[in-house]
Amino acid sequence: MIGRISSKTTALFICDIQTSFLKTVTQIEELIINNKSLMDSCLEFKIPIIMTQHDKNLFGEIVEPLRYSSSSSSSLSNVMVFDKIAYSMYTKELAQYVKENLPNLKSVILTGLESHVCVLQTALDLLENGYEVHVIDDATTSVQPKEYKSSLKRMKQSGVFLTSTETVIYQILQSDNHPKFKKIDELIVKRLFQINNINK
């Protein structure tokens, strides 16, 4: 298992990036930018996107920038949102959806909050069900930095691939000859510009 990613057998799972975390998570702006870039790129690649919101009465709705992806000309029909109470995204409802609609799914790009709770438990469930899991380390975090670092180690011990936003996008792109190269390059430049602005 070396962690190759193909747009034909991959989905993006975005876990619980909800409004209640806006004031409690450090560097939340960068995390949202990275997730938005991944979302826009996956729409261009026609990679399915599955999002969850955990107990939205308590944690609020998905943050505004991730509720849509206006920079992409691709159809938003590729985006599904599930409500959940369990920590793991991989609920019976979601598992059934994947079985019926994504029969070729082999690998999952996983992001979101919090890394040591919902993201970790999602990763373990996906691994247990035979999927390769690629956790994007700059698109997930926890309120407590110590828990974030610990969770990455824990997931790696179980066989999760740890990677970054830009790395995984280029891994899918593979070549400048890809028909989506120009659009993806624009999205990458846009992301870097936005991150540089918030870090000034």
UniProtKB/Swiss-Prot annotation:
Tell me the domain of life.
Eukaryota
- Gene3D superfamilies hit by this protein: Isochorismatase-like
In terms of PANTHER family, this protein maps to: HYDROLASE, ISOCHORISMATASE FAMILY PROTEIN 2A-RELATED
What is stated as this protein's family in its record? Belongs to the isochorismatase family.
Q: Please report the name of this protein according to its UniProt entry.
A: Isochorismatase family protein 2A
